[in-house]
Amino acid sequence: MTNTRAIYAVIAILAIVISAVESTGDFGDSLDFVRAGSSSLFSGCTGSIAECIAEEEEMEFDSDISRRILAQKKYISYGAMRRNSVPCSRRGASYYNCQRGAQANPYSRGCSTITRCRR
């Protein structure tokens, strides 16, 4: 008995939606919430996914993938922060002190449990 009531409810809702769509006259305009999420749904595009997706949606997809890849790493390299530039081109030099003859690691810290140095 409960199943038949559920079926009747679904049929009634579908009938209301269909009558609302037909009364507006234009199928595409009445379902803006569907078209906003998938611009190529009704276009009949037969190309690749990249060709069928609008440019702005494609760029959002690309940045989403980039964020996921960066989220998997524990660090961001200097190359990712500044494209086409090298922080220090001298071999073995520190990124922070890129002068000739400078120490590669000028920092010194005391021995403690946190630094795990051997005593």
Swiss-Prot record:
One of its GO terms (biological process) is calcium-mediated signaling. Pfam families: RALF. The keyword Nucleotide-binding does not apply. The keyword Cell division does not apply. Residues 24-70 form a propeptide. GO terms for molecular function: hormone activity. Residues 1-23 form the signal peptide. InterPro entries: RALF (IPR008801). PANTHER family: PROTEIN RALF-LIKE 22, RAPID ALKALINIZATION FACTOR-LIKE. This is Protein RALF-like 22. It comes from Arabidopsis thaliana (Mouse-ear cress). The lineage of its organism: Eukaryota, Viridiplantae, Streptophyta, Embryophyta, Tracheophyta.
